[in-house]
């Protein structure tokens, strides 16, 4: 059965971020994606200028009411949320999650708690971080913080892999069954590798791949693609190890393709066959 995912995050008309980054790779792995956009911008904000608007929170609810009105909400297998334009949007998204789970009790909520990257110029609206700590985290089935977001969610520093696993389990005690630490950064084993963790109450998997050097301008949307692909693989029945290994390889293929084409925006269309069938392989290690 094809899986249906309601993906609620940002949208850019030019380039790739949020749904504009994740939607196509998720479809390429065989999932139906229902993109619902929290913002519509001309381009992502790290260009330093952009046009567009943040959607009113009620818009999100209205769209989902429309899907419910044609009696299709029960076919939704998961809700994915990413970049929020406001904390109020978050409240509406949790209402949507409750509505989807009422229609399909098997449905999952995957929260990508985007809280900004100060060094990358990514900023979020006031109250969004607090929303994720107080409401998004306990409501989620799967949550995917980077290292900075993990520290905000668990409310203490995380300095190494062992502490990251323990921090992930602190989050699990509050709601989610699965935590993806989607970028270990300085808490990883190695400074010259890109490392991730996938943690449950009784399993922890670590994986690393080479960093792809883009100099000063790192592509945007890597985390959005990572979260979306992991959700698809898990819904399709992959084990934690299989899901982590495929996603790591697929994202690496996108990065390598983007670098080879000397582009700044992720080249998800050019890399599409390698997203489905990666040529590289990275092995996850059980901790």
Swiss-Prot record:
One of its GO terms (biological process) is pyridoxal 5'-phosphate salvage. Substrate binds at residues 10, 45-46, 224. Its EC number is 2.7.1.35. It comes from the Bacteria. ATP binds at residues 112, 144, 149, 182, 209-212. SUPFAM superfamilies: Ribokinase-like (SSF53613). Homodimer. This is Pyridoxal kinase PdxY. It comes from Escherichia coli O6:K15:H31 (strain 536 / UPEC).
């Amino acid at each position: 059965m094809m899986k249906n995912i309601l993906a609620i995050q940002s949208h850019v008309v030019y380039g790739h971020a949020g749904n504009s980054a994740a939607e196509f790779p998720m479809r390429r792995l065989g999932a139906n994606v229902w993109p619902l956009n929290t913002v519509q911008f001309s381009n992502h904000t790290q260009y330093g200028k952009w046009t567009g608007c943040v959607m009113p929170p009620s818009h999100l609810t209205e769209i989902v009411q429309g899907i419910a009105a044609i009696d299709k909400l029960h076919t939704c297998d998961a809700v994915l949320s990413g970049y929020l334009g406001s904390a109020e949007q978050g409240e509406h998204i949790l209402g949507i999650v409750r509505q989807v789970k009422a229609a399909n009790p098997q449905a999952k909520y995957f929260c990508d708690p985007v809280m900004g990257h100060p060094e990358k110029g990514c900023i979020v609206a006031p109250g969004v971080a607090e929303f994720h700590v107080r409401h998004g985290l306990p409501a989620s089935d799967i949550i995917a913080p980077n290292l900075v977001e993990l520290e905000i969610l668990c409310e203490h520093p995380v300095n190494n892999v062992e502490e990251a696993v323990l921090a992930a389990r602190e989050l699990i005690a509050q709601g989610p069954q699965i935590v993806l630490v989607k970028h270990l950064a300085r808490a990883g084993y190695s400074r010259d590798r890109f490392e991730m963790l996938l943690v449950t109450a009784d399993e922890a998997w670590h994986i690393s791949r080479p960093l792809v050097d883009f100099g000063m301008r790192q592509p945007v949307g890597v985390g959005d693609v990572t979260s979306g692909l992991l959700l698809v693989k898990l819904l399709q029945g992959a084990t934690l190890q299989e899901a982590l290994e495929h996603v790591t390889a697929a994202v690496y293929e996108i990065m390598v393709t983007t670098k080879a084409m000397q582009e700044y925006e992720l080249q998800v269309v050019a890399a599409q066959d390698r997203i489905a069938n990666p040529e590289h392989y990275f092995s996850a290690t059980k901790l």
